[in-house]
Amino acid sequence: MVYQLVPFQKRAFQNGSFQNCVVSLLSGGALFSFLLSIFFVLFLLTPVRAGELPKFFTYLKAVDPSILQEMRYYGSHNFLGRRVKGYKAAECILTMPAARALKKVQKRLRPKGLSLKVYDCYRPQRAVNDFIAWAKKPTDIKTKAEFYPTLKKSKLFGLGYIARRSTHSRGSTVDLTIVPLPPKTQPEHNPSKQTACFEEVDSRYKDNSLDFGTGYDCFHEKSHTKSRVVLDARKNRDLLV
């Protein structure tokens, strides 16, 4: 599902698991987008001291430390099976408006005993390039059993599960889910015991989020917005949107 802050609009979900809820900043229309693109080029070319962020960017924990973080691409539990290039820390970095928007959602969820959990936020272009390079290696299928068991790697871009240009690289997009509080301890991921991400909740990897019908980054039709999922998963999807 795609959320655009200004104006608000919903579109059909096209890439990855339904848990990938995308927040994009479109204030000011095309001119703003053009200027923001220029800013990101300068951001990538300008040296920044360790721990220092460019203006208009923030660590999510500085805006709302109660939002849980599980930065999948910094670790190995992702469809590459290793840390993705460009990720230097397990930190969610966003534009300030996007971070504040998440804080507002979190404020509504907490009284219900729920919390947001983010999986990915700002995504360096190096990471996108890493995805592209990975897709060109047909023999590297060590994560296929969990993340894309019914598809060939060569189909992932054409079907929209992975994008060659990611809105994450603008810092205004976030992959997230909803977790019951207090959060349960997740089992350590064992790559030698993979189960398909579209299996029933008791069979696939036991993420501590609500059941949305699939695991995170599930490249399968069951992750599509209008796919048929069990009633509880459908209710959770409705809550997320």
Stretch-by-stretch model annotation:
Residues G16, G28-G29, G51:
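Residue-identity detector for glycine
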Residues G28-L44:
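Bacterial N-terminal signal peptides
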